[in-house]
């Protein structure tokens, strides 16, 4: 199974929108690998760990097909790991997914309470 690191930054990402520290200035100047989106991972094509503010960007950047996603694991309920409004767009009327495409959501009680 392939592990793909989609992002590895904290909630503010790198470069931070309002930050002028050395790390963020270097990221702005050099770009490329210095630019870091918020933490998330893919395990194969059907398991995703965390679905934060950068989920759309990750999908475009890495050419992900989330109609194949079957398991979504939230490590915790902070917004940079759990951006639930984007999940609403998986419902009928917003997109078309195969009828048998069940998405299982995994997380602790705080995740399940927030997502409900």
Model-derived regions: residue spans:
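Extreme N-terminal starter segment of soluble prokaryotic enzymes
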Residues: 1-4
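Pre-active-site segment of Zn-dependent metallo-hydrolases
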Residues: 15-73, 77, 84-95
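Metallo-beta-lactamase
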Residues: 97-116
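Generic structural hydrophobic/aromatic packing signal, biased to beta-strands
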Residues: 6, 41-43, 105
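Active-site environment of divalent metal-dependent phosphoester hydrolases
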Residues: 78-82, 113-114
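Flexible, glycine-rich phosphate/dinucleotide-binding loops
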Residues: 12, 91, 112-114
């Amino acid at each position: 199974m392939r592990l793909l690191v989609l992002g590895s930054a904290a909630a503010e990402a790198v470069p931070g929108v309002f930050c002028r520290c050395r790390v963020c200035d270097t990221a702005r100047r050099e770009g490329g690998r210095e630019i870091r989106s918020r933490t998330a991972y893919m395990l194969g094509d059907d398991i995703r760990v965390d679905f934060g503010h950068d989920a759309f960007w990750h999908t475009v950047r890495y050419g992900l097909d989330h109609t194949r996603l079957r398991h979504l694991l939230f490590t915790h309920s902070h917004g940079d790991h759990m951006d639930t409004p984007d999940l609403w767009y998986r419902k009928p009327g917003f997109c078309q997914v195969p009828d048998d495409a069940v998405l299982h959501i995994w997380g602790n009680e705080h995740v399940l309470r927030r997502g409900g």
